[in-house]
C-alpha cells in the first residue's frame, strides 16, 4: 500500500457548527494524519478558481457562494491510500445516499452543505494541495 496525501476541506456548514474537531477525529481514527491545517475564509476569486472544473455546471454559482459564506478548514491528510480512505470516511456526496457512520451521513445538512470536500484522485490531490499550501507548510 502506498502512503499518499490528499486535500480535505471542512466546509462552512461544519465550521459554523464547531464540528472541525469531530471531523478531525474521524480522520485520525481511520489512520490518516493531519500534516497541514489552516482555517481561512475563501475569497470569491479563490473559490471560483478552486472549483473551476464545475464552471459550466448549473450549481457552480451556488457552490461558490456557499464556500465563501463562512470560514473553512483546509487540510492535508496523509496515510495509506489516503485519497480513497478519505472518500470512504466522507461518504457519498449526497448525504441521503451516504453510508451510516460517514461524515456526510452524520453531519451534512444537504447535498450542498455536505460538511467536507476531498480530492477525488491523486492527480487532483497534488493540484489542490498546492493551491492552498506551500511545501514548507506541510509537516509530515
Swiss-Prot record:
GO biological process: CTP biosynthetic process; GTP biosynthetic process; UTP biosynthetic process
Cofactor(s) needed by this chain: Mg(2+)
Record-level GO cellular component terms: cytoplasm
Cystine crosslinks: none
Keyword annotations from UniProtKB, A to Z: ATP-binding, Cytoplasm, Kinase, Magnesium, Metal-binding, Nucleotide metabolism, Nucleotide-binding, Phosphoprotein, Transferase
Subcellular location: Cytoplasm
Catalysed reaction, written as an equation: a 2'-deoxyribonucleoside 5'-diphosphate + ATP = a 2'-deoxyribonucleoside 5'-triphosphate + ADP; a ribonucleoside 5'-diphosphate + ATP = a ribonucleoside 5'-triphosphate + ADP
SUPFAM superfamilies from the UniProt entry: Nucleoside diphosphate kinase, NDK (SSF54919)
Any GO MF annotation of the entry: nucleoside diphosphate kinase activity
Domain of life of the native organism: Bacteria
Positions with a binding annotation for ATP: 11, 59, 87, 93, 104, 114
Active-site residues annotated for this sequence: 117
Listed Pfam families: NDK (PF00334)
Coiled coil: none
SMART domains: NDK
Tagged with keyword Magnesium: yes
EC numbers for this chain: 2.7.4.6
PANTHER family xrefs: NUCLEOSIDE DIPHOSPHATE KINASE
Protein family according to the UniProt entry: Belongs to the NDK family.
Subunit note: Homotetramer.
NCBIfam families named in the record: PRK00668.1
Record's function text: Major role in the synthesis of nucleoside triphosphates other than ATP. The ATP gamma phosphate is transferred to the NDP beta phosphate via a ping-pong mechanism, using a phosphorylated active-site intermediate.
Protein name as catalogued: Nucleoside diphosphate kinase
Amino acid at each position: 500500500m502506498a502512503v499518499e496525501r490528499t486535500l480535505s476541506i471542512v466546509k462552512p456548514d461544519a465550521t459554523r457548527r464547531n464540528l472541525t474537531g469531530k471531523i478531525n477525529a474521524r480522520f485520525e481514527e481511520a489512520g490518516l494524519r493531519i500534516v497541514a491545517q489552516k482555517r481561512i475564509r475563501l475569497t470569491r476569486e479563490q473559490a471560483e478558481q478552486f472549483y473551476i472544473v464545475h464552471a459550466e455546471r448549473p450549481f457552480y454559482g451556488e457552490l461558490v457562494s456557499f464556500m465563501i459564506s463562512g470560514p473553512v478548514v483546509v487540510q492535508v491528510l496523509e496515510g495509506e491510500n489516503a485519497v480513497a480512505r478519505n472518500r470512504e470516511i466522507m461518504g457519498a456526496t449526497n448525504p441521503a445516499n451516504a453510508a451510516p457512520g460517514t461524515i456526510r451521513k452524520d453531519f451534512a445538512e444537504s447535498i450542498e452543505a455536505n460538511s467536507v470536500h476531498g480530492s477525488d484522485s491523486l492527480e487532483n490531490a497534488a493540484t489542490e494541495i498546492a493551491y492552498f499550501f506551500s511545501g514548507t507548510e506541510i509537516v509530515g
